[in-house]
């Protein structure tokens, strides 16, 4: 169905705070990045709509952390969101050039095409917004009195709004609203309601996955390989760090950060596996913020991001090529440190060391080279369902 007067905005800029907090030991992946086969949930949700409707524009919002990464994956336009849903919507509306807009949360991934068709029919000239709703089955009590449950509506998305009215409703940036209908209602605009569906209930807490598991395929078992290499020359009178461990040495490494060549190579390998660029893009040496930065922090930030977008580490294999210092006395401590940062068993981290038999810059004891290789895969959220309460 062609909708050349309607744009689609998919809200995907949230941090999944409630979702991750509801099972913090298990879920470090944001809900919009849960994989369904090969695709993240935000892409599944968007394609569920674009499969049935041809919108003039399709726009997704992404958090500042995810923005560049999502751009590299998305076949649709991606705009950077704000700190709140309202701010993200304001940013997206700047790019809309149609009179109508359909706004949906990617956490409501299973939108009904028949309900949307009903919404389109319900949008007459007097209506600024059409929303789907479901009722409540339980007796409801609020602030000292029982409510008439037949009058209670639980509002869902997607919501169909007139762009001009919605922009006016969101003009005051000091006000925050949880959805489009509440913003338009506060402006005195007329809202129309159509019957929604329990299938469009929002995925908010990790326990909600139980209701979705039969309709969402498990993640692909594909393995992703990443390689990283880094070299640093020695610098006298500087502390030496390798693999997160302080090394007894008369010199350290010449670098903008602390120069931990092991953690730098490992960070690049992780970024390579997930298609996340390189460590120089994340922590540029032109930024004084990272002057003498702790490479353990850098690795932790990169891996936390990798988990947040749906990946987990299977194993890491690290080769340290050095004439000096001697690596053997520190290998065990390095493994423990790296495993702790990456939240994996020590057995998943392997560290090897070799010399160049006196050849090259390493043999001349001018510096150290490290190569790292990692294997990673999608977090299999299906296996965690049994642990949910």
Curated annotation (Swiss-Prot):
Pfam family, one: IspD
InterPro entries: IspD/F, IspD/TarI, ISPD_synthase_CS, MECDP_synthase, MECDP_synthase_CS, MECDP_synthase_sf, Nucleotide-diphossugar_trans
Entry-linked SUPFAM superfamilies: IpsF-like, Nucleotide-diphospho-sugar transferases
GO terms of molecular function: 2-C-methyl-D-erythritol 2,4-cyclodiphosphate synthase activity; 2-C-methyl-D-erythritol 4-phosphate cytidylyltransferase activity; metal ion binding
Pathway it works in: Isoprenoid biosynthesis; isopentenyl diphosphate biosynthesis via DXP pathway; isopentenyl diphosphate from 1-deoxy-D-xylulose 5-phosphate: step 2/6; Isoprenoid biosynthesis; isopentenyl diphosphate biosynthesis via DXP pathway; isopentenyl diphosphate from 1-deoxy-D-xylulose 5-phosphate: step 4/6
Binding site for 4-CDP-2-C-methyl-D-erythritol 2-phosphate: 230-232, 256-257, 278-280, 283-287, 354-357, 361, 364
Catalyzed reactions per annotation: 2-C-methyl-D-erythritol 4-phosphate + CTP + H(+) = 4-CDP-2-C-methyl-D-erythritol + diphosphate; 4-CDP-2-C-methyl-D-erythritol 2-phosphate = 2-C-methyl-D-erythritol 2,4-cyclic diphosphate + CMP
Sites annotated Transition state stabilizer: 18, 31, 256, 355
Residues binding a divalent metal cation, per UniProt: 230, 232, 264
Alphabetically ordered keywords of this record: Isoprene biosynthesis, Lyase, Metal-binding, Multifunctional enzyme, Nucleotidyltransferase, Transferase
Region (2-C-methyl-D-erythritol 2,4-cyclodiphosphate synthase): 224-389
UniProt keyword annotation of Transferase present: yes
Protein name from the UniProt record: Bifunctional enzyme IspD/IspF
Species classification: Bacteria, Pseudomonadati, Campylobacterota, Epsilonproteobacteria, Campylobacterales
